[in-house]
Amino acid sequence: MAATNLENQLHSAQKNLLFLQREHASTLKGLHAEIRRLQQHCTDLTYELTLKSFELTGDSSSRTTELKRRCEELEAQLKAKEEENRKLLQELEQKNAAIAVLENTVREREKKYLEELKVKSHKLSMLSGELEQRASTVAYLTSQLHAAKKKLLSSSGTSDASPAGSPALASYKPTPPKDKLPETPRRRMKKSLSAPLHPEFEEVYRFGAESRKLLLREPVDAMPDPTPFLLARESAEVQLKERPLVIPPIASDRSATGQHSPARDKPHKTHVGVAHRIHHATPSQAQPEGEMRAVDQVNASKVVRKHSGTDRTV
């Protein structure tokens, strides 16, 4: 029994060994076939690579030259752009410096202009106040001259110098100029338009005979000349300007009594500058004298001043 079992085991072992040898041989055959196939593929690839390498060696020099030329062109363009950028930066810096200088100049000029404007405004306000005071003085002196003429006519024998039935006019007394009024933008503008350019002379309108306004030029501090109020100037060509009445008019002696005053009987020998030179002559026929205007309205800028190079003095 034991020998039979051993023989069976030996026989099965031999069969298994034979089977393994056959499988091993078939495996080796497949491996050899795969190796041959791979060797053939490698040979084909080597051949193709050799052919391509021969083709590339023909135009490699021209391609290299073209690439170098293109690279040099790009480098030149890059350098040009860098130079242009540098110039633009320099120009920008110069413009920024010029802008800073101009801004400083503008600020300095603006500061200087504001200072000058402040000084001129102060000077203008002072001159306006002085002008207003002098205008008030002129109006007050004009009223005093009217009163002096009235007294002169009454003392010469004309008792009808004032119209009857006007007690308010008879009791009228001129008053000195009032204090300076408060400044307002509108008054300041009117004063600036009528302010004189020369500080020593100014031209003002005065009332003359027959309600005519005589343009006289004289120093502002001098006493007004009473000649226009005492002498008749019928033939003089003077500038006329209507003004509203402030007080009732003073009737002339000629219109009330029909007589001439002693001052009117005198010949006209005095030459008066009235806006242009006027040669006086004795009138052939006496003209009626109008009503005399009294005090101007000072606060409404009624005193007219003109500036001229011609000296117009009485």
UniProtKB/Swiss-Prot annotation:
Pfam families: CCDC92 (PF14916). This is Coiled-coil domain-containing protein 92. Phosphorylated at Ser-192 by TTBK2. Keywords: Coiled coil, Cytoplasm, Cytoskeleton, Immunity, Innate immunity, Phosphoprotein. PANTHER family: COILED-COIL DOMAIN-CONTAINING 74A (PTHR14882), COILED-COIL DOMAIN-CONTAINING PROTEIN 92 (PTHR14882:SF4). Interacts with CEP164. Interferon-stimulated protein that plays a role in innate immunity. InterPro entries: CCDC74A/CCDC74B/CCDC92, CCDC92/74_N. Disulfide bonds: none annotated. GO terms for cellular component: centriole; centrosome; cytoplasm; nucleoplasm. The modification Phosphoserine is found at S192. Residues 176-186 have a biased composition (Basic and acidic residues). Residues 266-280 have a biased composition (Basic residues). GO terms for molecular function: identical protein binding. It is found in: Cytoplasm, Cytoskeleton, Microtubule organizing center, Centrosome, Centriole; Cytoplasm. It comes from Mus musculus. Residues 1-27, 59-113 form a coiled coil. Its main location: cytoplasm. Residues 153-193, 251-314 are annotated as: Disordered. One of its GO terms (biological process) is innate immune response. It comes from the Eukaryota. The keyword Cell division does not apply.
